[in-house]
Amino acid sequence: MLCLPVFIILLLLASPAAPNPLEKRIQSDLIRAALEDADMKTGEREILNIIDSISDVAKQICCQITVDCCVLDEE
């Protein structure tokens, strides 16, 4: 008589529907990390700094190749 309820409880615990605490914690950590990554946005100032850096490098390369770029910057 007692074996049937114990068997049912063990069957429920061993079923794939029962969440594994470690897997559940890992999933929640991954979800939290994904949400934090989604909140990170590149600021407009950072984008402008990157564009300015690329522009400076392009000007240096242009000045090494031809004088026309350097003359335009000085005027």
From Swiss-Prot:
The modification Pyrrolidone carboxylic acid is found at Q60. Expressed by the venom duct. Keywords: Disulfide bond, Neurotoxin, Pyrrolidone carboxylic acid, Secreted, Signal, Toxin. The keyword Lipid biosynthesis does not apply. It is found in: Secreted. GO terms for cellular component: extracellular region. Its main location: secreted. The keyword Cell inner membrane does not apply. Residues 1-19 form the signal peptide. Transmembrane segments: none annotated. Contains 2 disulfide bonds that can be either 'C1-C3, C2-C4' or 'C1-C4, C2-C3', since these disulfide connectivities have been observed for conotoxins with cysteine framework V (for examples, see AC P0DQQ7 and AC P81755). One of its GO terms (molecular function) is toxin activity. It holds the Pfam family Conotoxin. Residues 20-59 form a propeptide. The cysteine framework is V (CC-CC). Belongs to the conotoxin T superfamily. This is Conotoxin Vn5.6.
